[in-house]
Amino acid sequence: MQFTRGLLALVILIAPALAPAEECEVELFVLGAGQDAGAPHIGYPDDPAWADPALGQTATSIAVVDHVAGERFLFEATPHVTRQLQLLDTLAPADGPGLGLDGVFLTHAHIGHYAGLMYFGREGAGADGIPVFVMPRFAAFLQGNGPWSQLVKLENIVIQPLAAETPVQASKGIHVTPLTVPHRDEFSETVGFVIVTNASKTLFLPDLDSWDEWAQASGIDLATRVVELDHLFVDATFFQDGELTGRDMSEIPHPRVKDTMERLSGLSPELRQKVRFIHYNHTNPIRFPASPESALVSARGFDVARAGDRLCLAP
């Protein structure tokens, strides 16, 4: 399978629609790869993206498109969903009118992962019955709290409850299974998704507290998952401790990129290349492709997901 690096986001947004790099029945598109608030970041006046918008980043989101069925599925509705759907329309145009979304899968109720639902309402797209796949607590949160409850009442969205480790058929060629993971669960569960086609299994896991905690809860460690899966998009919020000035980062759970690479250092190059880092904070230097840290990730045999990337999941 071929993983094709996308063009710069600005170029993508103004370019004509691009055909898949190869004949591909099911294709994954990276629409954003940043942490919830993106970059430039609120309250961070020194971010270079203020002066150079090309250095900005949107919150993490992917789309999976079944080209045979003509169906598109969004994973995460971020605060940047307007720009991200425009990017998707450029890369894989919808067949009909409206947003062209046949379903939205949400991992958890933190702002960068669901706040974009607000644009589906009457003040924005005025969407009609978009299926939104969420875990039970998350479903109750959306149904019982405004403004999300208005989206449900007006049927801009239709809640589709999920169950842990129970696959749902998104389209004829795509099945999606939620896996619960440890994270701050103030308003909802937190899950990662395994996206299964007839040719591959892909893990989308932008947020979790600890690889060790997940392994203890699930009985499966990270290295085993790398062996069993074909592609993994995993939490890269921080590169290493010390990124946040004046903060004790031991109190901020997230696997560090350096730790994840070290954990998997004993795997073969063929296995390590399955892993792609996503959901990086504005302080994480891998957000810059030319940084020494990005070069280190590549040298260690891993990859960094970037907006505009595309990956064939079923040739």
Task: Describe every region a protein language model picked out.
Residues 1-7:
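Bacterial N-terminal signal peptides that target proteins for export
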